[in-house]
Amino acid sequence: MTTSTTETSPASGAVHVGVDVGSLHLDIAIQGKTGVRRLPNTDTAISRWLKDMPAGSLIAMESTGRYHRRMAELAHLAGMIVFVLDP
């Protein structure tokens, strides 16, 4: 039996991230780490944080109408696997 990787497979070293989205800030939880990191919901803060993330990490966030879009777009452009969930 052979297995194949798909475009949505996480890269080696990738992490799973959950993001609670707000209009002014993002609360970020990383699987295996204790606590939550709060970032301003701005291009600069998000881009800086994404530079420290392993390529191909999986980032899941709630659909908030518009406030999630900045994180979703920047994460996608940075090579992350992005899930926008509609609760």
Task: Please describe what each predicted stretch is.
Residues M1-P87:
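Phosphate- and other anionic-substrate recognition elements at nucleic-acid/protein interfaces
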